[in-house]
């Protein structure tokens, strides 16, 4: 288990920010996050968040994905106090991180997001993964689907992707 103690990290805010669509709240204060071919369950506790992964997985992927080495507090402190608009935005979304997502996954989700709402986008992404993503297994033996590769989507054909 890895602990994140950072006041500028809030999974609920990140999940609702519209950056990614494979982050789900499965119980109060419990989140399942899928990124590329990776999965992690994260629980909120009184001190921050606990990631259900080992140090190696955290260092190789999740630390970078959540941009945890960037000091967001310093950006917030640098905002001119007289800029009420930016100050209010920073206070409202102080827990949002800029996710460092896989470029392919980000482009495809961006294209799907056009003229759609978050619920519909999540459904489209989930179906893409179910139909065209490679099978993966997490550390507990549970099976999930990776985000499909360009080759997998190209092989599906345009008609199949439209349905």
Residue ranges and their predicted role:
Residues 1-163:
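HhH-family (HhH-GPD) DNA N-glycosylase catalytic core used in base-excision repair
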């Amino acid at each position: 288990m890895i602990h994140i103690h950072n006041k500028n990290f809030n999974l609920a805010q990140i999940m609702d920010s519209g950056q990614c669509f494979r982050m789900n709240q499965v119980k109060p204060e419990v989140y399942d996050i899928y990124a590329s071919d990776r999965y992690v369950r994260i629980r909120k506790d009184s001190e921050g968040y606990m990631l259900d992964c080992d140090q190696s997985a955290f260092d190789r992927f999740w630390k970078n994905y959540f941009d945890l080495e960037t000091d967001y507090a310093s950006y917030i402190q640098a905002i001119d106090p007289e800029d009420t608009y930016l100050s209010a935005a920073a206070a409202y979304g102080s827990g949002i991180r800029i996710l460092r997502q896989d470029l392919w996954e980000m482009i495809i989700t961006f294209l799907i997001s056009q003229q759609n709402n978050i619920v519909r986008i999540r459904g489209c992404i989930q179906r893409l993964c179910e139909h065209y993503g490679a099978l993966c297994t997490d550390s507990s033996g549970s099976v999930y689907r990776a985000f499909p590769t360009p080759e997998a989507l190209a092989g599906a054909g345009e008609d199949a992707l439209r349905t």
